[in-house]
A protein has these predicted regions:
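Bacterial N-terminal signal peptides
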Residues: 20-32
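Glycine-rich beta-strand-to-loop/alpha-helix junction loops that act as flexible
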Residues: 129-135, 194-199, 279-286
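Bacterial Sec-dependent signal peptides at the C-terminal "C-region" and cleavage site
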Residues: 31-42
């Protein structure tokens, strides 16, 4: 990817999903959970069950393990393990899938499955396996059969609307404190996910009716253009063997015009997307931007600003190495510095310089079109797990 020694690693129609309040309340508790690595524990007076979830997307394999303690009152859910195994499962610059794509995916899923069963003792019947909608729309022909032969698991793809709904519930905190007062955060926030092959967004609205019980509307947007697919589009436009300078000039000249137009068309039917007070960013691009800008910030929600996004777009276009290969000795804590260095290495293995440049332009265009100048913007570090977390949680409480 970068020249350093590293390890390799049609627009949708407007859609609104209306859910009964009872179903949505099950989703509302998700963000109170903390995912990480921990040993299962058995609280006094309770029985414990273990569940696992695996999600396959163009960006990789996301895996979680949950411990459910059945008490007299209600189930208590605790995250005991989470991991992101990054892969490149999308089409390459020539429009074809890498020949080893299905094999790599099956190996990663097999690794996740083994870890859930052997290390965390999750029974096979309590492990749920889903595929992201973008991968479902465009994937290698043999992907499902190769995974099934290697793991015994059947891949069930989500549709885009359901995926966005689950991601919103699993990523955006239910409440938010403003001047010491708790407010309904999901009714004033939006989720934006920049994927490799698509860009998704969504938000929640509580609607009241004099004829029926309250219901939530999950408004979803999905544009079939992501960081890698846009970079491939630019590469084809400038021609094979073109220089990084030519690529960057094309990105800046076109300013992601096709993506901008698709976004504007979506906003015609979803104008409220511009009026959310807070924005939560997820996906590999958001992770790379937040890490390269603020490597020392390791909290769950990393704040970034509109100006950060504008400046990142210019800096990464001017010299990708300036950010991706920066000196990290200013981080005094050695353990933290090592963790950050591993993240930087992972970023360089995940993205080519051209892809970071293209992705930064897409992020800039989104910030401009959605008018983020006065918004609160956050990179949601655990947002990549939001969908599979919500999906597994709903299976548990059924």
């Amino acid at each position: 990817m970068f020249s350093s020694k590293i390890r390799s690693g049609a627009e949708c129609a407007p859609k609104v999903l209306t859910l009964p309040l009872s179903v949505c309340l099950l989703l509302c508790v998700l963000c109170a959970m903390t995912l990480g690595q921990a040993s299962p524990s058995n609280p006094p007076g309770s029985s414990v069950e273990l569940y696992g979830g695996i999600e396959l997307s163009n960006e990789g394999v996301k895996v979680i393990a949950l411990q459910v303690s059945q008490t007299d009152d209600e189930p208590s859910i605790k995250g005991i393990y989470s991991e992101m195994i990054r892969l490149r499962l999308g089409r390459a610059n020539d429009g074809e899938f890498p020949p080893q794509a299905s094999t790599d995916a099956a190996q990663a899923v097999s690794t996740a499955l083994s870890r859930l069963q052997q290390q965390y003792k999750v029974p096979p019947e309590r492990i749920y396996f889903i595929g992201a909608s973008g991968l479902g729309a465009d994937h290698p022909k043999d992907l499902e059969s190769v995974i099934r032969d290697a793991t015994g698991l059947t891949l069930n793809f989500l549709d885009a609307v359901t995926e966005v709904q689950l991601s919103v519930a699993g990523t955006i905190p239910r409440t938010w404190k403003v001047a010491g007062v708790s407010t309904d955060n999901r009714n004033t926030s939006a989720l934006i996910h920049f994927g490799n092959a698509s860009t998704q967004a969504g938000y929640e609205m509580l609607k009241y009716s004099s004829f029926d019980s309250p219901a939530f509307d999950f408004v979803a947007m999905s544009i079939p253009q992501g960081v890698i697919s846009y970079a491939n589009e630019v590469s084809r436009a400038v021609g094979a063997g073109s220089t990084l300078f030519s690529f960057t000039r094309q990105v800046k000249t076109s300013s992601a015009s096709s993506f901008r137009q698709a976004l504007r068309k979506e906003l015609e039917s979803k104008p409220n997307l511009m009026h959310r007070k807070r924005v939560f960013l997820t996906g590999n691009l958001a992770w790379a931007v937040a890490t390269l800008l603020y490597p020392q910030y390791r909290q769950t929600l990393v704040p970034i600003t509109y100006d950060d996004i504008m400046q990142f777009s210019e800096r990464i276009a001017r010299d990708p190495k300036e950010l991706a290969l920066r000196n990290l000795t200013f981080i005094r804590d050695r353990k933290l510095r090592k963790e950050v260095e591993q993240d930087f290495e992972a970023i360089r293995a995940t993205f080519k310089p051209q892809e970071l440049i293209a992705g930064a332009e897409m992020l800039k265009v989104t910030a401009e079109e959605l008018k983020w100048q006065n918004k609160e913007i956050f990179f949601a570090r655990l947002g990549q797990l939001g969908c599979i977390l919500s999906y597994t949680r709903l299976k548990i409480v059924k």
